[in-house]
Amino acid sequence: SAASDVYKRQAVKSMIVKNVNEVEEVASHVDFVFSAVDMSKDEIKKIEEDYAKTETPVVSNNSAHRWTPDVPMVVPEINPEHFEVIESQKKRLGTTKGFIAVKPNCSIQSYAPVLTAWKEFEPYEVVATTYQAISGAGKTFKDWPEMEGNIIPYIGGEEEKSEQEPLRLWGHIEDGVIVKAETPVITTQCIRVPVLNGHTAAVFVKFKKKPTKEQLIEKLVNFSGLPQELELPSAPKQMIQYLEEDNRPQVREDVDYENGMGISVGRLREDTVYDYKFVGLSHNTVRGAAGGAVLCAETLKAVSYTHLTLP
């Protein structure tokens, strides 16, 4: 509402911005930290652990801890059970309440939930090309004018993340650490396109148990997880929508589906080389970043891993 927006602006107006390195000082004023900082990977690893050691839970958008064996990397609809690894992480850090949880890269949100919905058909080979918005680089057209009318066929580090991070989401806990899944094999190309918000993916899939198109669509529209079951505030009611029109999903039409927390899928059809192909779209700064982190925090609160009282 307008009244609540005014209240929020007033609340922010009186906040004092502090230096991230003043760990004890900052931690004394908060009971939760969202981390999205522009530092080196080693610096991020250390600062996030420093905050956790003050008994402050950390949910991170950074990539630094995504492969730390006892740090859960979670999309709450896909692998909330990975939060259980927090107990062994706390032992390592020597904490009772403090820990780090991370969310995966924005590039995989357009296809990882889709492949999860189809897991009973055993996808084993995936080719994905992502078309990624400039906000993923923290830019707008005003400060990146050379992106107007342009495409850049390379985004540093993005292809490795897009190929490997889904396997960690689908992994399992063994001896207090997360062991990644071995399949499916995923190969990607990640391309920067002149779009402000919204990552699109063109994806080809082979299945061990080839389903019908109708079965695939049914799995998509009925896909839900713990956030939907718990009716968490940021959770989309229907995580994945399927669009029948040949010209959808489109960024302009569909990127804000479910307030940017849902995934839009279209153009599902049989393929001559692979079994099926489709196009997926997600909001890279909402589901893919800030919103995904908030949903992680809400899920952690709901499953009693934190001492928080979230609104």
Model regions: which residues?
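Conserved small/polar residues in nucleotide/adenosyl-binding loops
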Residues: 2-10, 306-311
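A structured beta-alpha segment of the ubiquitous adenosine-cofactor-binding alpha/beta core
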Residues: 9-45
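Receiver (REC) domain switch-region micro-motif
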Residues: 33, 58, 203
